[in-house]
């Protein structure tokens, strides 16, 4: 089984992710854009039990803008780590947090909110897949 290590910007918090993600892609929602201070968020989705804080758990802060997303960050440097989605039993570990993971996007979600069009041939979902409560509808690139 593969194990990938990650850490915050200053290294006070370290994590591991075990196995392979449930999915990976790009989120274009306003919430992710605002949180990441960028036009798109590269995500990797893991089952909750695959993600472990291995160092500095006392330095992990949390912000709940919604009940669906519990955003975790380092209290020392402010570096973003991951977002826990308890309703789905999934954790979104930002691709940049685990630099050795061979990121390969498979989908764009919330593309209807996109401010950066990406013509890469991947499926573009209007919101979320239907199994996660979205419409599952695709939109043009």
Residue ranges and their predicted role:
Residues 1-141:
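A short Gly-Trp-Pro
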């Amino acid at each position: 089984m593969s194990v990938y290590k990650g850490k915050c910007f200053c290294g006070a918090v370290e994590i591991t992710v075990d196995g392979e993600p449930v999915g990976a892609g790009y989120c274009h929602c306003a919430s992710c854009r605002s949180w990441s201070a960028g036009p798109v968020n590269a995500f990797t989705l893991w089952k909750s039990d695959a993600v472990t804080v291995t160092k500095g758990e006392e330095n992990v802060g949390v912000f709940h803008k919604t009940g669906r997303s519990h955003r975790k960050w380092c209290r020392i440097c402010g570096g973003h780590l991951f977002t826990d989605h308890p309703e789905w039993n999934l954790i979104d570990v930002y691709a940049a947090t685990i630099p050795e993971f061979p990121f390969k996007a498979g989908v764009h979600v919330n593309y209807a909110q996109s401010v950066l069009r990406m013509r890469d041939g991947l499926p573009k979902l209007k919101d979320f897949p239907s199994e996660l409560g979205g419409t599952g509808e695709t939109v043009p690139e």
